[in-house]
Curated annotation (Swiss-Prot):
Taxon lineage: Bacteria, Pseudomonadati, Pseudomonadota, Alphaproteobacteria, Rhodobacterales
Name by which UniProt lists this protein: Phosphoribosyl-AMP cyclohydrolase
EC number(s) given by UniProt: 3.5.4.19
GO biological process, one term: L-histidine biosynthetic process
Predominant location category: cytoplasm
Keywords: Amino-acid biosynthesis, Cytoplasm, Histidine biosynthesis, Hydrolase, Magnesium, Metal-binding, Zinc
Gene symbol of the encoding locus: hisI
A GO CC annotation given for this chain: cytoplasm
Record-stated family: Belongs to the PRA-CH family.
Assembly, per entry: Homodimer.
Length: 121
């Protein structure tokens, strides 16, 4: 059985987790997990993060319906970052965009490269 203690967490007991669409390879978002969030994710198959602002667990899509189902969890070579291959339902970003990475720096200017899926976002 996978031991979450084998991961390298920061001073706050957190590890960065990058969510990526398992089919398209699109990077969706980055959030934080602690050991218990990793355990809950592996046990339930629904991605659970640790919210630094709320200081509590955050099951992705619990309130919005924009669920992330875990397909595979990967650990980087230094064991200090996770890659979550997910099946994403709806937008991943709280701005109703498919990805949280919706701005780019092009020719020295920041530009929005992805519109919200729901214009009322």
């Amino acid at each position: 059985m996978f031991d979450t203690a084998s991961l390298k967490y920061d001073a706050n007991g957190l590890i960065p987790a990058i969510a990526q669409d398992h089919q398209s390879g699109e990077v969706l978002m980055m959030a934080w997990m602690n050991a218990e969030a990793v355990r809950q994710t592996l046990d339930s198959g629904r991605v659970t993060y640790w919210s630094r602002s709320r200081q509590g667990f955050w099951v992705k899509g619990e309130s919005s319906g924009h669920v992330q189902k875990l397909v595979e969890l990967r650990v980087d070579c230094d064991r200090d970052c996770l890659l979550l291959l997910v099946d994403q339902t709806g937008p991943a970003c709280h701005t109703n965009r498919r990805s949280c990475f919706y701005t780019a720096i092009r020719e020295g200017q920041e530009v929005v490269i992805m519109a919200p899926q729901n214009p009322s976002a």
